[in-house]
């Protein structure tokens, strides 16, 4: 029965299409894009036993486990209900097949657990709610309450336009983007997305707990009178959507929200900006489309009176900070010309030393700029204590193309320097002495470039000498 189902056209046709467009991109012998289908828990236990923990890993898992322990203690559910849930998640973390997805999503699970526990935290543990700070900052920074300005004129068409990004796309698009990153991004990119998305929301909830602030709808309903935790929330402009559709989609949910006074920072803005940053990283050609989506959601949050503009800026800054940390710490490079995850034969990450202008290993972007190239060589020579001159390898960039669209890989030289194009200031006698050391043949692109290699140049060489030689 099972074999007949697998052989049916309903299963075979999608598999053939998936194999044609995705699996056919995989290079023979490459395993970097493979998934782990092992279900033996002993495999994970052996890895855990021999794993050497770094300081970052200890802080990462210690921080998340401490929050989960707080949730376990505070959440008012029976121990016999919480224990099976913990055991189920522990099993998913130990099975290799599921742990490759559940473990990177641990920040997301921690954020969700803390969010739904906020309403159960005793009120005496919570700080006072601020009502005047956000509208005052809005007026000081931007001259007016932008949320009230945008919500002055309301129509059914504008309500629908604001409802789509705020009430529909916001809750569904993270799952769509995760699938897109898994298919079209490099291997391990989905782990980075789970880390960044989870930590951004987790830190945002912690800030909302430490700094509870009333949203614009509170000022419209209660003015600037003091707020307390016994008050119910409001759907704001989304209440008009419930009346328009005749369905209670948001009124009850927002009235009994876990965090009613969580205006700052806006996690709607934070999630949106995080999604836009990953989309710009994955598909940079469509930046205008992604930025348009972010502007659309920003407008909807203020039109529906759920956030001030300063809340949106706070969420965006939080998202940008977490993304930049993830980008330079965990996120692999997205190579142009590669179609999907199965097109990759190796995983490369950003080397901060190569993009830092003050670093010894800095590589100028414009290799044809003689002045910047000369300055880099002189600066590097001044940092090297040994008097011997290092070999001058040419820099290469590997440009990988998908096998089904182009069968071979091309090598693109980044430097046009040859033995006949020497830097002024090097004597011919020095060249003859170094003839035995410097090879005229091009180094192999499969060999690692020596980290200590620099361009040899005289310390007396300057930009003026370069200009005089040209004349």
Curated annotation (Swiss-Prot):
Query: Per the UniProt record, which residue ranges are transmembrane?
Result: 55-75, 78-98, 101-121, 169-189, 192-212, 259-279, 282-302, 305-325
Q: Where is the composition biased (Polar residues)?
A: 399-422, 451-462
The main location class comes to Golgi
Q: How does it sit in the membrane?
A: Multi-pass membrane protein
Sorted keywords for this record are: Glycoprotein, Golgi apparatus, Lipid metabolism, Membrane, Sphingolipid metabolism, Transferase, Transmembrane, Transmembrane helix
Keyword Ribonucleoprotein belongs to the record: no
* Enzyme Commission number(s) from the entry: 2.-.-.-
Q: Which stretches are tagged as biased composition: Acidic residues?
A: 427-437
Q: List all topological domains (Lumenal).
A: 76-77, 122-168, 213-258, 303-304
Any GO BP annotation = mannosyl diphosphorylinositol ceramide metabolic process
Q: Where in the cell is it found?
A: Golgi apparatus, Golgi stack membrane
Report whether Transferase shows up as a keyword of the record: yes
* Carbohydrate-modified residues: 145, 228, 256
Give GO MF terms, alphabetically.
inositol phosphoceramide synthase activity
One of its Pfam families is PAP2_3
One GO CC annotation, please?
inositol phosphoceramide synthase complex
- Cytoplasmic side: which ranges? 1-54, 99-100, 190-191, 280-281, 326-471
| Free-text activity regulation comment from the record | Inhibited by aureobasidin A (AbA), khafrefungin and rustmicin.
Enzyme class at the top of the EC tree: transferase
Q: Where is this region: Disordered?
A: 398-471
Which family does the record assign?
Answer: Belongs to the AUR1 family.
Matching entries from PANTHER family are given as: INOSITOL PHOSPHORYLCERAMIDE SYNTHASE CATALYTIC SUBUNIT AUR1, PTHR31310
Functional note: Catalyzes the addition of a phosphorylinositol group onto ceramide to form inositol phosphorylceramide, an essential step in sphingolipid biosynthesis.
Record protein name field: Inositol phosphorylceramide synthase
Q: Which gene encodes it?
A: AUR1
